[in-house]
Amino acid sequence: MITLIEIKKSLDEILSKIDGDKKYINEVAKKITPITYKLLYINETKCIRCNLCYKECPVDAIEKAKVKKSAKIIEDKCVKCEICAQTCPVGAIYVIEGRAEIEDSEVHYTIKEKSIPHRKIRLKKYELDENTCIKCGICARFCPTNAIKAVRRKSIEVNLDLCMGCGACAEVCPKKCIKVERELGEVIKTRDIEVDKNLCVGCLVCIEECPINAIDQDGDKVKINKDKCILCGRCVDVCPTNAIKMWEKK
């Protein structure tokens, strides 16, 4: 976790600017629980147009990249599962976490960039139809490993020893004369999740809210299919009895 911003400010200083009963406001303020949020965004200058994030997003929350436009996260559809960040072969997707809390009569506000593990990616097969290729060089422009060397309108060379198999070249090729087959590793489970059956009241709100239908009714309780779960935390947020817990693995 990399700290980007850290602010500490006296609670008394903040409350002094608020009208009303200072003693009452101070007591209420100290009972406020920490507020957290998470934001994912794509660095447009680093995006290589491979569209792996678009293809791997389980809730279709990413707009497909085009030659002149990077991929884009659709905020109101994103469930913050971090799969896109794990999948991006060049680390162009950032996960930012913010937290505000009152501690020792101070308001603490921090913004951090979360360290994300990356799925393995490996080239399996590469095909270039040289008869169709117009040697425009767009593929070379977006190749993140400089595996493609092109002389505009004259020649193109691909060094497969350098190719990682991201498929950016195939995505941007105007003639669709490149085919790439890759091996993509499993999503890395950085968190775990459990249902406390003693707290679960069987309201089934979590089942209704799960974006990928990974929760099933289990008698008068619920159970989570961990193989299917994307660990987005939506069920944790909506559970009225705090029966679902999710935590970071060490």
UniProtKB/Swiss-Prot annotation:
Pfam families: Fer4, Fer4_21. InterPro entries: 4Fe4S_Fe-S-bd, 4Fe4S_Fe_S_CS, Fe-S_Ferredoxin. One of its GO terms (molecular function) is metal ion binding. Residues 38-67, 69-98, 124-153, 154-183, 191-220, 220-249 form the 4Fe-4S ferredoxin-type domain. [4Fe-4S] cluster binds at residues 47, 50, 53, 57, 78, 81, 84, 88, 133, 136, 139, 143, 163, 166, 169, 173, 200, 203, 206, 210, 229, 232, 235, 239. Keywords: 4Fe-4S, Electron transport, Iron, Iron-sulfur, Metal-binding, Repeat, Transport. This is Uncharacterized polyferredoxin-like protein MJ0514.
